[in-house]
């Protein structure tokens, strides 16, 4: 098991280093000049001002030297200074990251609450109309893009086109310390938008795993002994079927971080993803690199932990 964990940790480190390299290259290949962006001019800029600012930002150094400085800084926890916000990148990310993690965490809880019981129920009702409805809904849930679902929720629940008598807030953020009620009210729509697609994936995996467990010899033997169906399901089938489901939940937790990029911008939720889009528009190299690095690190770390957990639960994969 020790060697298995070391392999997974080593793979994660290599992947993270590869991501850092690719991100640096792609950011510096972006069209547009951050210096001209900061000076606020694209035509006839003052050459002296341009060169002075370029030197100040370190953009006049050879590209390999810039890369080496960024890697060394990142290893020391220093991702540089944001061009647009004039503060350390880590400080800017530190303000936004908890909001993104909160959104992803709440969405995952909702996805599990929706997906797990529906998956078990769908397996129990296999071949019936209710199973067809649930599997069709799951297929739709996995195929509808996050931003489309977000705008549909805004139209239905914020514009109140069906005259429910209330309108949900469609954008913005309220600090929980100032108004907890308003905070959670503004969290509902983006969290459900993220949750539904994940819930559909969890439901399909749960259904598949439960069906496989139901067809096993051990379950048939328990039924032959006269055990009631709900006891067979709750005490034996669910426990055996949930190892691949736990893996799916862990993998989807990593995917949620990517899903927040669209969701946060649809609902104007001030998390890490909206900061990333803002930094791209500003050609803020250090902030772009920092945001992508942190999001990638979360994704890679989550996948590594899921693999290790799966290895603990199922020794065959070690």
Language-model features: locations:
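Membrane-water interface segments at the C-terminal ends of transmembrane alpha-helices
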Residues: 23-29, 58, 72, 136-169, ...
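An internal, D/E-rich "acidic patch" concept
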Residues: 59-116
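Hydrophobic alpha-helical transmembrane segments of membrane transport/permease proteins
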Residues: 16-68, 162-183
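Hydrophobic aliphatic residues
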Residues: 30, 38, 42, 74-75, ...
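Transmembrane alpha-helical core residues of multi-pass small-molecule transporters
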Residues: 11, 19, 42-43, 110-111, ...
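Alpha-helical transmembrane segments of integral membrane proteins
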Residues: 2-3, 97-130, 146, 175-318
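N-terminal signal-anchor/signal peptide hydrophobic helix marking the start
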Residues: 6-12
